[in-house]
Amino acid sequence: MKFVDEAVIKVQAGDGGNGVVSFWREKFVTKGGPDGGDGGDGGDVYIQADENLNTLIDYRFQRFYEAERGQNGSGGNCTGKRGKDITLRVPVGTRAVDIHTNEIVAEVAEHGKKVMVAKGGWHGLGNTRFKSSVNRAPRQKTMGTKGEIRELRLELLLLADVGMLGLPNAGKSTFIRAVFAAKPKVADYPFTTLIPSLGVVSVVPEKSFVVADIPGLIEGAADGAGLGIRFLKHLERCRVLLHMIDIFPIDQSDPVQNALTIIDELEQYSEKLANKPRWLVFNKVDLVSEEQADEIIQEVIDALGWEEQYFKISAVNRQGTKELCYKLADFMEQLPREEQEVSEEEKVNFMWDYHPDANQGEVITEDDDDDWDDWDDEEDDGHVIYVRE
């Protein structure tokens, strides 16, 4: 199945049902009083995470989703039926972003998690609600409010512990082939990897972690150049980044400049991503002498001012890959997972407030020259009940 990690859809919550003007009619009861019921609330729109899905391809074909409208009220103080909700199933790790405000409306990172993305309209009030000691035959009602309409961009973010980044042909996919059973395409030309891929590394039965491989970055990626910018978002949930550096590039470019390019693109894309734990991994050490490799590595470390961990490997020969995986597994145990806390400022405000609108909604008055003289008017559209003697 084609991997689709973005889709734009439009969702519309159901409108609220209208209140109704009605009066109780019964034999021998000349003035039964108002009995108009309220309308029903409109249905809401939700997204729900489903671990059985791994792509957003379905939302490329159907782009409009609408919840059911609430039914109008009726006589006999009958409240209209609430509109049915609609739930959109998406892969685990999907977030919904409002394309107009760029705010994150919802994010589902666990199987079964369900979040509202569009709120249904508030029901209208029937004339019974307006009855008082001075207005015993009210002809006022309110209309239901409109349901919320949103245009959303669904973004699928892969859930992985370790994210790999580097220039094209740095050896990321070769490393993937070396450490687990997945066999991504490997070749000696740039952008061999076209879509992100995931793999599970099992060091020992009780120690494992998930690695995400994305297409290589190039200079200007943060501004949209190359393929990597589209997939950088998949690294946002990774707990540690592996920065793969080719010490013997096939295009004879400078490893120092290549390393600086990646860090610069990370910082331009997201400060949060740039501040994640990051390890340097120097690949292809088998292509040069040990002294030459150490010299190149030292130049890179000095240029970056690097004081953290770094590793020397040869992915094609699996030299140093096992030790790196053990180090990563130990690091995963020590590093706690980020807890997603929603602050007051981050909470999504819907376009209209659910309860206040009930009091501020438009009041509809049915005109009549004489409210008190029309109790027995057969042309009135009030609710009539006939009772057998």
From Swiss-Prot:
Its main location: cytoplasm. Its cofactor is Mg(2+). GTP binds at residues 166-173, 191-195, 213-216, 283-286, 314-316. One of its GO terms (molecular function) is magnesium ion binding. It comes from the Bacteria. Residues 160-333 form the OBG-type G domain. Keywords: Cytoplasm, GTP-binding, Hydrolase, Magnesium, Metal-binding, Nucleotide-binding. One of its GO terms (biological process) is ribosome biogenesis. Residues 359-389 are annotated as: Disordered. It is an enzyme of class 3 (hydrolase). Mg(2+) binds at residues 173, 193. Residues 1-159 form the Obg domain. Residues 364-381 have a biased composition (Acidic residues). HAMAP family: GTPase_Obg. Monomer. Belongs to the TRAFAC class OBG-HflX-like GTPase superfamily. OBG GTPase family. This is GTPase Obg. The lineage of its organism: Bacteria, Pseudomonadati, Pseudomonadota, Gammaproteobacteria, Vibrionales. The gene is obg.
